[in-house]
C-alpha cells in the first residue's frame, strides 16, 4: 500500500514535470502556442486517466507494481530534473532581481555615508568660494584643503546651466545627443576625469593629497570658470575674454597650483604636477569658451549648410571617382595577370 | 492553573448570577451596532471605494490635484502638499510644459530648440538632484514628498509659457519680449518662493540657503528656457 502511494506521488510529480516542460517550450517561443497548450492539457487529462487505471491495476495485482514503479521513477526522474532546472532558473532570476532592488535600496539608505561631505554652513561655502580666487604664497607648509563636496557639486551644476545657456545662445547643434547631455557630460567628465588624473599624477609625484581633497580643490577651482563663462557668453568681446581668462582663470589656477606646491616635495615633481594641473585647467576654460561661441557657430554653419555650394560638393563629385579608380585598378591587375 | 481557572469560572458565574433576573424596561434600547462612534469617521468612508461610481473616483483625484494647484498659487504654510503627495499633477505639468516648448519647432529639424525629452529629463533629473541634495544636507522630508512639491511648483512657469505663446501669436516685437521677460521673471520668483515656503521647514535653519540655491538654479534654467522660446518666424 505504501509502495503504491509512493508511486502515485511519483506519477503526479511526472505530470507536473511534463507540464513544466511544455510551459518552458511555450515560453521560449514568446508567443503562446495554442496548439501546444491544447496538447498539454489533452495529454495531462489522458495521463490522469492512465494514472487512475494504473493505480487500480496496482491495487489488484500487487506483484507487478514494483517493477512498473521503478521504471516510472527512472523515467520521471529525468522529467523531474528538467522541471527542477526551470524552477531553479526562475529562482535565480528572482534572486538576482531581489539583489538588484536591495542594492538600489541600500544605496538610498546609505545616503548617510555621504552626509559628512555635505556638512557645511552657508558662510563656510561663501568663504571657500572667495578663497578659491586668492592664491596663498605659502609653500613651505602644507596648506589646508577642505574635504567637502557641496560647493564643488553646486558649482558643477551651475556650470552645466551656464554651458546650456552658451550653447543655446550660440546656436550650437549637436547631431547625436542633446545639449543637456553634452553639457552634463562635459562638466562632470572634466571634474571627475581631471580629478582622477591629477590624483594619479599626485600619487606618482608623491604629493600629500587624497581623492576627496582633489575633488574639492578642482571643484572650487571651477568657480573662476563659471564667472568668466557667464560674463563672456553674454558680452562678446575677445579682448575681454582674454583679460578675464588671464586674470580670473589665472587666479583660480594659481590658487590650486600654490596648494599643490605646498604639498609636494622636489622640483621635478612640483613642475610635473603643477604644470599638468595649470595646463588642463586653463585650456579647459579656453575650450569651453570657444567651443560654444559665435566663432564656431560660423564653422558649424558651413559644415551643416549642405545646400550652400562650396567644398561640401566635393564629396558628391568624389563619389563617381571611386568606382573609376577601382575599375582602373582591377583593369591593371587583369592586364598584369594576362601577361 | 486549573484551580485558578476553575475559581475564575465559578467567580464569574457568581458575579453574573445576580444579573439573570434583572429586567430591562422596554424604552431603553439595548441593541445596536457594535461600532465605536468615534472610529467611523472619514477614514473608513474613504477606504470603501469599491462600489462607488468611477466618476466619483476620478473626480476625487482631480479635486485633490486641483486643490494642490490652488495651494501652489496661494503658497501658505500648509502641509497639504506634503501630507498626501501624488505625482499626477507634476506629470501633467511637466508634459504640458514640454509639449508647449516643443510645439514651435516641430517642423524644422535642426534648430537648437528644446526637445521634449530634454525638458522632461531636466525637470525630473533636476528634481531628483535637489531632493538628494536636501537629504544630504540633513533635511527631514521623504523623497517623493519633495518630488511632489517641486513638480507642483512648476505650475507658475507653465502658466508663463502659456502667456508667452499667446504673446508670440500676437507680435514678435521688442515690446512683446519685454512683456515676456516680466511675466517669466514674476512667475520664476513665484515658483521659487512657493517651493521654498513648502520645503524650507524641513531643513535645518542654518542651512536653508544651501538647500534653496539648487532650487533657484533649477527654476532659473526652466524659466530661461521658457523665455528664450521663440516660434519659427
Swiss-Prot record, chain B:
Biological processes per GO annotation: endoplasmic reticulum to Golgi vesicle-mediated transport
GO CC terms: Golgi medial cisterna; Golgi membrane; Golgi trans cisterna; trans-Golgi network
Keywords: Golgi apparatus, Membrane, Transmembrane, Transmembrane helix
Taxonomic lineage of the native organism: Eukaryota, Metazoa, Chordata, Craniata, Vertebrata
Pfam families: Yip1 (PF04893)
Cytoplasmic side: 1-84, 133-142, 202-208
Disulfide bonds: none
Spans within the Lumenal topological domain: 106-111, 164-180, 230-233
Gene: yipf6
Family named by the database record: Belongs to the YIP1 family.
Membrane topology reported for the UniProt record: Multi-pass membrane protein
Protein name, entry field: Protein YIPF6
